[in-house]
Amino acid sequence: MSEKILLIDGHSILNRAFYGLPDLTNAEGRHTGAVYGFLNIMFRIMEEEKPEYLTVAFDLSAPTFRHKRYEAYKGTRKPMPEELREQVPLIKEMLAAMGINIMSLEGYEADDLLGTVARRSEAKGMDVTILSGDRDLLQLATDKVLIRLPKTVRGKTTIENYHTAEVLEKYQVTPPQIIELKALMGDSSDNIPGIPGVGEKTATKMIVQFGSIENAHEHLEEVKPNKAKESLREHYDMAQLSKELATINTDSPLEFSYEKAKVENPYTPEAYELCKRLEFKNMLNRFDPVTAADSSMELEFFTCNDLSGVEALFEKAARKEQVGISVLADPDQVYTVGLVLDEKEIYQIPVGGLLTGDYLCGKLKALADSTVLCAMDIKAVLKHVPLEEPEKVFDTGVAAYLLNPLKSSYTYDDIAREYLDGMMLPAKEDLLGKTSLKKAWEEEMECLGNYACYQAFVPCMARGVLLEKLDETGMRKVYDEIELPLVFTLDSMEKWGISVKGEELKSYGEKLKVRIQELEKTIWQEAGEEFNINSPKQLGVILFEKLGLPGGKKTKTGYSTAADILDKLAADHAIVKDILEYRQLTKLKSTYADGLGNVIGKDGRIHSTFNQTITATGRISSTDPNLQNIPVRMELGRLIRKVFVPEEGFVFLDADYSQIELRVLAHMSGDEKLIQAYREAEDIHRLTASQVFHVPLDEVTPLQRRNAKAVNFGIVYGISSFGLSQDLSITRKEAAAYIEKYFETYPKIKGFLDGLVKEGREHGYVTTMFGRRRPVPELKSSNFMQRSFGERVAMNSPIQGTAADIIKIAMNHVYERMKKEGLHSRLVLQVHDELLIETKKEEIEIVSRILEEEMKGAADLAVELEVDMHQGDSWYEAK
C-alpha cells in the first residue's frame, strides 16, 4: 500500500474557518475562532486520511513572481481583517507545538509549494491529498492526487472530493484545463483579468471544443458566439497573461524534507497547554492523561495524617505571614484539607481517625488569628470554616476576576499559568476526571490529595502578584472594600436561604396548569385544528401558511417563531398574543412551579448560590435556582412571589433603589438639567417627554411618557435607533429623532457617552466610578456588528457597573450593621437593585432605618439615591 502525504493550504483553510464559524475569543480577549476551526478540519482530515506525512503551506507577505509579471495581481483583494491576521502566528505556533511541518518560500505562493510537493510525491509513488478552500488547486488533481475542498456553513463543515473524474464530471474539463478556463473568464478574487465578455459558461464551451486558448486562437473563425471570437482576437495577449498567472508552479525551488514532514503524535504536552491557554476545552479530550500529566510542573507534596504531626504543622503555619488552604468537601462531609506554607512545604491532610473534619476546620479557624489564609474560593471555605474577618483572608478567584472579568472560570491551573510565570499545572479534570470527591476519598486518595495541594499552592504563591496587579490597575480598593467583604455577605445569604411554602407552590402550579390548558384550547380554536404548540415547525406552518400571517421567515428547518418575530404580530393577531402567553406560562410552570419544588431543603428553605465572578459588569448573579429571573411583568408571573414567605415572627422588608442607573448617569455625565430634575424631585420620564416632544409638562400623554421612559433607560444601555424602533414599534427615522432630541435636551450626556467609547478605544477598557475595569476588546474589531456591540458595552458598562458597585456596598453595610447591632433580622435576597430582608417584627423600625441610611449612603452622588421600601408577609406583598 502506498504511503500518503497530506498537504494543507494554511491561509485558505484558516480563512474558511474564520468566515464559516462564529467569532470566538478567549478570556484574554484574543480571537481564536479561526484557529479552532482550522484544527477541527485538520483533525478530521487526518483521521480520515491517516497520512504518513503532513505539511502546511503558508503565503508570505513579500511579492511573488506573479506580482512582478502583473503589478495588479490580487490588487482588488481587501486587507485581511485584524481578527484574522492576529490568528496567523497563533496557528503557526500551534502547528509547531504539534510538531507539524510548515513551509513557505519568498517569491512563491502557498499554491506553488503545494503543487511542487504534490508532483514530487506523486513521482515517488505516494498518494497525495491536498486540503484547500481554493478551487484553483483543482488543476493539480490526478488519479493519485486528491483535492479536498471544505465548506463551512453555520458551523457545519462538508467536504467535496476531486480526482480527475470528479473534476471532469462537474466542470466538463480536465484538471489542467481549469487553467484554460481561468485564462478566458479571469478570476476576480485574484484580479486575473481574463478577456472581456467571456463568463464561465462561454469559457467552458470554448475549452470543451478547442481544448486550450492556443487552439481556440488558431481556429478563431470557428469560435462562437461572435462576441467571444472578437474578444479573443482583440485580447489574446491578456488571455495568455491570465493563463500564466493562473498556472500553479509545480517546480518551485523548494527545499523540502520528508523526514521533517513525517507525522508523529501531534497531541504533545506543548500543544495541550496551548489548547488550554486558548480555552479549546473540547479539544483537550484528544490528549491522553499521560500527555496532560507530562505537560505539568512537578511539585513535591507531603501527607500529614497523625495528630501530633498536624499540631506541629499548624504551629509552624501560624508563624508564616500567609498560608494557602483548601477544603475539599461536600455539604455535610469534609474529605481532605490542603495546607501550603511555601513552595517547599505543601501538605495534604486527609480526614480519618482523630483527624475529623470538625477538628481540621477548627484548626483553620484558629490559624486565621495569626496569619492570612489564601484560598481559591473563600466562600466555599466559609461553608465549613466559620471565619469572620475579611482582612484575614485572600480570595484568589475574586482577585483574578477583577483583573479579567471576561473569563468564564478562574481555576488554579489558569491562574498559575497567567500569574506564576507560565507555570503549568494539571487541571482538576486531569487529576480526578469525573470522579466525585467522595469516591476519590474512598478509592483515589493520592489524586484527591494532589488536587487539595494544588488548590492551596496557587493561592499562596499568587497572592503577592495579584495584589500588585490590583494596585497597578487601581482596583485594590474595589477588592478590599467591595468584593472581599461581599464574599461574607453572600455566604450569609446562602446559609440562611429563603423560606418557601410548599403547598402554596403546588397551588400556584395548579393555577398555571389550568390557565395553560385554557390557552391550549383557545389557540386550537383560533387555528382551526389541534397541533403541538411547542413545536416551532408545526406552529410556523399554522401561522404563516394556514393563517397567512405576515412576516414569516423560512429557514431550513421551517419558519422562525422566535419571540421577536411573534412580538411584532401580537397586537394585531389574537392567536399570537395567546401563544406568547402560553409560552411564558409553560416556562413559569417548568422553571418555578415544578423546578423550585425540587430544590427546597430539609429546612423548608431554598439556598440559592450567589455568584460574584460571572458577569463582566460586576453584577451579582444567582444560580441553583436563579431567583433573579422571577418575572415581574405578568400578574401570574408576579404571583410566584407569594410562595416566598418569612418564618413565623418575621416579615419581609423590601428595599429597592429608584432609577439608580439614571441617577448614576446624571452624576457621571454632570448634565445640569438632569441633575436639577432629580434635585427637584421631578417625574424624570414626564420631564423628558415634555422636553423631547415639546409639550407642556401637564399635557404629556401616557404614551409620550412611556416612550420617554424607553429612551431614558435605552440611553443607559447604549441603545441604537434600530433597537429603540423595535421597542416602541416606530420607524428607525422616528427613533433616531427621539434619540437626537434626547441629547439636545441633556447635552452633556452625548459628550459623556462618546468619551466612554473613546476611552475604551484608547485603553482597551472602561471604568466605573469606583475604579472597576471592564475590558472591551470588541472595539478593535473590523466587523461592524462587533464594533457596534463594543461601543454599546463601552457606554453602558460604567453606568451598570457603578450601579452594581453601589448595591454591593449597600449590601455589605446593611449586613455589617445588622450583625454589629446583634439583630435577628437577615439579608436573604438581592435581585438587581432590590434587597429583601427577613425582619423580626420587633426590629422593623431599626432595620428600616438601617436600610434607609446604608442604601442612601452607599455612594456620594450629585443627586440623592432614592429607596422605595415596603413590607409584607410574603415577597409578593412586600413588593
Residue ranges and their predicted role:
Residues 441, 495, 607-608, 612-615, ...:
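Conserved catalytic core of nucleic-acid polymerases
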Residues 235-354, 435-632, 645, 651, ...:
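Conserved "right-hand" nucleotidyltransferase catalytic core of DNA-directed polymerases
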Residues 7-8, 130-132, 324-326, 393-394, ...:
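Short hydrophobic beta-strand that contains or immediately precedes a catalytic carboxylate
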Residues 154-182, 189, 301, 333-471, ...:
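Active-site-proximal helix-loop-helix substrate-binding element of RNase H-like nuclease domains
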